[in-house]
Amino acid sequence: MSTLNEIQFQIINSLVFAEPFDTLAEEVDATEPVIAAELKTLIDKRFVQVLEDVEGSLRKSFYYDSDNMRAFQYQATSRGLDGLNK
């Protein structure tokens, strides 16, 4: 497992429960473009899963619009949460 940098650590720590991108923008100490880039990296590593709202219920999404990160919610996976303990 790769080591998390400080921004990635903050992102995963904020995503114990499903949260929108705006919550990350408030809680993580970085600019929105940096948060978005690090979030995309965490998604690629399967440390974070993408969730979409389908008729009022959050469901796992197998794709996301990287140009519109606010359209989805995000949650740390068990693999991502394990990274907090390293």
Question: Which sequence ranges carry the predicted segments?
Answer:
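Low-complexity, flexible helical/coil segments
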Residues: 8-12, 48-52, 84-86
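Short amphipathic alpha-helical interface segments
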Residues: 2-30, 37
